[in-house]
Amino acid sequence: MSDKKYVVYYHEKVNEYFYDYYPRFNMNEQYSKPVLYSDDFELIERAKNELNERLQEQSY
């Protein structure tokens, strides 16, 4: 585990999930919706990738 905190968030305008360091994440961004907070980078990266795969599957 890392000392850094991460957030996975959904960006409605571009219809995609992203991750960022929690301190840089702007909670007031109109189109960004947080979905997961963690200090486990591997979990954050895996969650973002799997959520984006599901979005692609739903769009077909």
Residue ranges, per PLM feature:
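Short aromatic-glycine-(Arg/Gly/Cys) micro-motifs in beta-strand/loop hairpins
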Residues: 3-33
